[in-house]
Swiss-Prot record:
Molecular function, one GO term: cellulose binding
InterPro entries per UniProt: CBD_sf, Cellulose-bd_dom_fun
Domain (CBM1): residue spans on this chain: 25-61, 68-104
UniProt lineage: Eukaryota, Fungi, Dikarya, Ascomycota, Taphrinomycotina
Protein's UniProt name: Carbohydrate-binding domain-containing protein C2E1P3.05c
Signal sequence coordinates: 1-23
Organism: Schizosaccharomyces pombe (strain 972 / ATCC 24843) (Fission yeast)
Biological processes per GO annotation: carbohydrate metabolic process
Cross-referenced Pfam families: CBM_1 (PF00734)
First-listed, main subcellular location of the protein, grouped into a coarse class: secreted
UniProt-annotated stretches for the region Disordered: 115-163
Length: 197
């Protein structure tokens, strides 16, 4: 009887060591459990499940997790991200790189946006990426250079300049400040031609 009792004790001890070793090799709650180039454990500790977010990232989420999903345009995944990986209704978690996924509305199609969104985008684009160099030339040897956000300008200015800069050329609601390189000269009476590229 002593032998059978000793055998059961050793067997129980061995099984508990094996299960502890297996559990310690699994990812903890909210830990990474999968993804391209991920070389860590792909199992999760008891009480959580490995949830796929995108090809680069899967995370151990508690089975009893009842927390809120990420709101529209919030982060919903990525390497070292420890937050909700689900998105509120009407949006989905879109992969934007290995470190960032974001909740994007399901019905957004970049090619068909509303007119107000289009004009907002156009306005932003005009101020940040449609920058061109404009040169004013005249028959006199001095020239004036400026940078403008107006895509193209063709106009004539025929007034005197006595300060170092002036505002002119209002086209489609945009105005630009042109800086003079020679402030002692006046504009010729025939005018300066302003062209933009």
């Amino acid at each position: 009887m002593l032998t059978q009792s000793l055998f059961l004790t050793v067997l129980t001890l061995a099984l508990s060591l094996v299960s502890k070793t297996s559990a310690s090799q699994c990812s903890p709650r909210y830990g990474t459990c999968g993804g391209i180039y991920y070389d860590g454990p792909t199992c999760c500790v008891v009480g959580s499940s490995c949830i796929y977010s995108n090809p680069w990232y899967s995370q151990c989420i508690p089975v009893d997790y009842t927390g809120p999903c990420a709101k529209l345009y919030q982060q919903c995944g990525g390497i070292n991200y420890n937050g909700p990986t689900c998105c509120e209704p009407g949006s989905e978690c879109i992969y934007n790189g290995p470190y960032y996924s974001q909740c994007i509305p399901v019905d957004i199609d970049p090619s068909s946006s509303s007119s107000s969104a289009a004009s907002s985008t156009t306005s932003t684009t005009s101020s940040s990426s449609l920058v061109s160099s404009t040169t004013l030339t005249s028959s006199s040897p001095s020239a004036v250079s400026s940078t403008t956000s107006i895509p193209s300008i063709s106009s004539t200015i025929s007034s005197s300049v006595s300060t170092s800069s002036f505002t002119s050329l209002s086209s489609s609601g945009f105005s630009t400040v042109l800086s003079s390189t020679n402030t002692t000269s006046a504009l010729p009476s025939s005018g300066w031609n302003v062209t933009g590229y």
